[in-house]
Amino acid sequence: MVVHVDPEARGDERGALLAFLDAERGGIRRALLGLSDQAAATRPSASELSLSGLLKHVRLTEQSWLERATGTAAEPAEGGTYADQEHGYELVGEETVASELAAWEAAARRTEEFIRAADTLDATFALPDAPWFPPGQRVSLRWLLLRLITEMARHAGHADIIRESLDGAVAFELVAKERGRSGGSRRGG
């Protein structure tokens, strides 16, 4: 991890989990630092992934898990499949990197408010009815946070590779840039 996550106050499990979640979000946000919408949409490898596509995907992912946990999720369309999520990896219409970042920031704020207001991280909600989940299974809010952390971490790694492929910028340099510092070691040493 490129940035330090401060230790939680003794016994503050939810604070620690939220801090690590936000640190992983930061890796994705920083990968977009200084890029135009056009550059962020570039796919510099054989992969279909772009930075703007990853941004939209993680925003939709966090938003949909929060809706599921709060009981406000809309039911999927009849016959919906994983392939229906194709536009979840690209900006369409009037969507921009700035609008997706703002929407993601709002989703992140709602996630934190919901988790902090919960009586316990042991509270559960039902997993969606989807072929990749066991039918009828319930998971805890703790599971939700761990799921979001792993999702963000996976895509922060993708974002690091995509950004370096675009212009050579690496995470340590982007942290320095974000903090208004010059340089930043390519290897963090």
Show which residues each predicted segment covers.
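Short, contiguous alpha-helical
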Residues: 2-8, 14-33, 37-87, 127-189
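Active-site rim elements
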Residues: 12-17, 97-101
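Acidic/histidine-rich alpha-helical segments that form the ligand environment
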Residues: 87-127, 139-153
